[in-house]
């Protein structure tokens, strides 16, 4: 998505 977020497993997504 662009912003740093954490998925339901706690992994960083960008």
Swiss-Prot record:
Main location group: secreted
PTM annotation (Phenylalanine amide): residues: 14
InterPro entries: Gastrin/cholecystokinin_CS, Sulfakinin
PROSITE patterns with a match to the protein in the record: GASTRIN
Functional summary from the UniProt entry: Myotropic peptide.
Tissue distribution: In larvae, both sulfakinin and sulfakinin(6-14) are expressed in the CNS but not the ring gland, thoracic perisympathetic organs (tPSO) and abdominal perisympathetic organs (aPSO) (at protein level). In adults, both sulfakinin and sulfakinin(6-14) are expressed in the brain and thoracic-abdominal ganglion but not in corpora cardiaca and corpora allata (at protein level).
Identification of the protein by name: Sulfakinin
């Amino acid at each position: 998505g662009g912003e740093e977020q954490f998925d339901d497993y706690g992994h960083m997504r960008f």
